[in-house]
Design a protein with these regions (language model features):
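Catalytic phosphate/metal-binding cores of nucleic-acid and nucleotide-processing enzymes, i.e., regions
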Residues: 1-209
Length: 209
């Protein structure tokens, strides 16, 4: 048995529409790119750097300025997580990603399946040729996985007795950037990782998805 979950900008936009229904007073959206704003002094003059350029800062894009092309499709990176020093901000991010995971499980009819033996592969296809580290998205995988795998009841748990192995790889697709979550399910008695990999490869070989 296999499952394929594909996260695209279109899918995240669909989640944002749901999010706005649930949170009608929200001013920004959890999975949208930040917008760059110019900084001004109280008298209206621009704030300048030492080199004379106008200072800017990034902030969450407002709901009124948001459009589907602003949606994120990739998993949060460790680089993005490690710079967060405020515990409340970190907890808020974990909460949003967990809720997205629960929503994905509901959308794909995976909630409460309580599966007990599987392997999971995360594949992130970027729209640029930036050379990303595969392990850089491991932190983000944990956040979305808590909602998708555990809180939704899709799996019994997310420990290594349930998910083993876990694969991470990155790729490039300018026309269709996305994150694929590929899941192969096995009988409880199958523990050999290499046999699982063989079956998983057959499940998702080119043209077999």
């Amino acid at each position: 048995m296999k499952y394929l979950i594909t996260i695209t900008k279109e899918l995240v936009h669909e989640y944002h529409l749901y999010y706005m229904q649930q949170n009608p007073k929200c001013k920004s959206l959890p999975f949208a790119k930040k917008e760059t704003i110019k900084l001004f002094n109280k008298n209206g003059t621009p704030q300048l750097t030492k080199s004379g350029a106008q200072k800017t800062k990034k902030k969450s894009i407002s709901k009124k300025n948001y459009k589907m092309s602003d949606c994120l499709y990739g998993i949060l990176s460790l680089n993005e997580l490690l710079v967060i020093q405020n515990r409340m901000v970190m907890n808020g991010i974990k909460h949003h990603w967990g809720n997205l995971g629960i929503w994905l499980a509901d959308k794909y009819n995976l909630s409460n399946l309580k599966l007990s033996n599987c392997m999971v592969e995360f594949r992130v296809f970027s729209e640029t040729l930036a050379k990303k580290d595969n392990d850089n998205i491991s932190g983000g995988i944990k956040f979305v996985g808590d909602g998708l795998f555990v809180q939704s009841g899709f799996l019994e748990d997310d420990n290594y007795m349930i998910i083993n192995p876990l694969l991470i790889n990155c790729g490039y697709d300018k026309l269709n950037p996305r994150t694929e979550i590929r899941i192969s399910v096995f009988p409880d008695e199958l523990k050999d990782v290499y046999e699982k990999l063989r079956i998983h490869t057959e499940n998702f070989k080119e043209g077999g998805v």
